[in-house]
Amino acid sequence: ADAGVDAVFFDCTNGSLTWQPEAGVTLAGGMAGEKYFLYYPYQETAKMAGKVNATDTTSDGDFFATLINDWQPEADQSDYTQGYTASDLMTATGSGSKADGKLSLSFSMTHRMALAVVEMPKTVYKFTDTSIPDYVIATTADFSGEAKPCRNTDGTYRYFVRPGQGNTVTLTGSYADGKKEFFITPNNISVSSYKTYKVDGAPTIDKDHNLQVGDYLLADGNIVGKDETLTEEQKASVIAIVFHAGHHENDASDY
């Protein structure tokens, strides 16, 4: 594609990619020898100066070689948008096809960095009422220092690093109210791959629990029975109390 077209927008929420050229730019499609290259996340034009090898179009790896070699993931990746996805450099080369006057572009993105996945110990509540599914809590960690990973919805922490050896970044974390510490220096992870680091072996702790109205839910996700005596720390951490809505076995009302 024209080297002057340096901005694209794509939406991966539904697995598709949509090319939106700059205003006034028309993609003709069907020209002999044309190639399309894509990178993410978008960088301002000034930051892309000298990052594209426009004469080397063998592959997107060659085309974006300078960008890839110079790329440095953010130190603080705790924010999903500003840190985590902003560190996830991806590139692609695409082919265009024209039908009914419309140009369609197909891309397959390649991750150019490596990913460290930090797995924490888990607590699994198994309720005496077997109709209630198990309740799983991944331990929350606190990270000090500049390197901070992003917490994923599955409870793991994820952090992008440059692939291979030579990383000096260390994830310094703690859990159990700071009583337990851990240190992880992600290294020897191949490009476009991930490596899992299990903190203290990431054990799973099973807890049998009889869930009752009046039980307490704490901010860290743990449950304290209604008949247990709460510590001052637990009292300050209560965010919800279990209750019952609607009829129950001892409710004879007709509302």
Description of each model-found segment:
Residues 90, 124-133, 242:
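A broad structural signal for short, well-ordered beta-strand segments within beta-sheet-rich domains
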Residues 94-98, 148-149, 241-248:
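Short amphipathic beta-strand and strand-loop transition segments with alternating hydrophobic
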Residues 174, 188, 194-196, 200-255:
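Short, compositionally biased
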